[in-house]
């Protein structure tokens, strides 16, 4: 399968067809295999890439940098305090400046409209490293990881549940990705934390074409039954007020992934996924604060699940690099 994605932006999965997404997943697997075999070809030699981070990051930044270096490209990191974007210079103007200097631009920040504006005016490929609404590079990594742990199933044969805050960028993006790839997704969350109705409707329309099944439920037992994968994310996202914790913890505690929830799947081969970072113990500053305030050593997932044989979170994290590399190679490579 081969598609010409050269000079395309990668802003959200809604912009891509099922076959284009599958192509990117296949390219990711090929590039991963080549890296391990030491046979990787540098198709981005001589390219210059700008990485704009208005929100801090570990995995996304490292994945973009290593992927670029592996492919022979040079990168410039522009951090939260390292530019005039939105302060003295509009994104429209910034896009037109950087587009003259760089061959590709990554953006990680706030509203989806910002990265869309960047993509409209830059004149070079723009890649969404995360916005408040969508996190498309993460979904490619998730689906590659699912394929690697599928026990012979294709994506369209898989069932997975996302538990927790289903209205955040991960809930949105997993729903879109599942709809595109014909998967059975269950969004298991308090009703107030379901995705926006317009996005659900859009995904349901896509599902009619792909055979996907989208279920929104508040019932954990119903939502996880028969799942191949269980997925969660932090309960309070970057940029949200600290005051949100009390209400969020009270609402979300029933949706914690623990060993009881693992057993409720009825699947001894079920796997646990998380985009990271995760609050699974009290070994971080925030983790200690949570343990002291709420008497919980883990929030969205317990330590015994996170460190168990069910967990594939570090395979998932590594795959950020391989899938991001595929996006850059497909849209920018020679």
UniProtKB/Swiss-Prot annotation:
Protein name (database record): Ornithine carbamoyltransferase
Compartmental location: Cytoplasm
Matches recorded under InterPro entries: Asp/Orn_carbamoyltranf_P-bd, Asp/Orn_carbamoylTrfase, Asp/Orn_carbamoylTrfase_sf, Asp_carbamoyltransf_Asp/Orn-bd, Orn/put_carbamltrans, OTCase_ArgI
Listed pathway(s): Amino-acid biosynthesis; L-arginine biosynthesis; L-arginine from L-ornithine and carbamoyl phosphate: step 1/3
GO (cellular component) term, any one: cytoplasm
Stored Pfam families: OTCace, OTCace_N
Gene Ontology MF, one: amino acid binding
Record keywords, A-Z: Amino-acid biosynthesis, Arginine biosynthesis, Cytoplasm, Transferase
Family matches, as Gene3D superfamilies: Aspartate/ornithine carbamoyltransferase
GO biological process: arginine biosynthetic process via ornithine; citrulline biosynthetic process; L-arginine biosynthetic process
Gene that produces this protein: argF
Annotated positions binding L-ornithine: 169, 233, 237-238
Binding site for carbamoyl phosphate: 57-60, 84, 108, 135-138, 275-276, 320
Catalytic activity line of the entry: carbamoyl phosphate + L-ornithine = L-citrulline + phosphate + H(+)
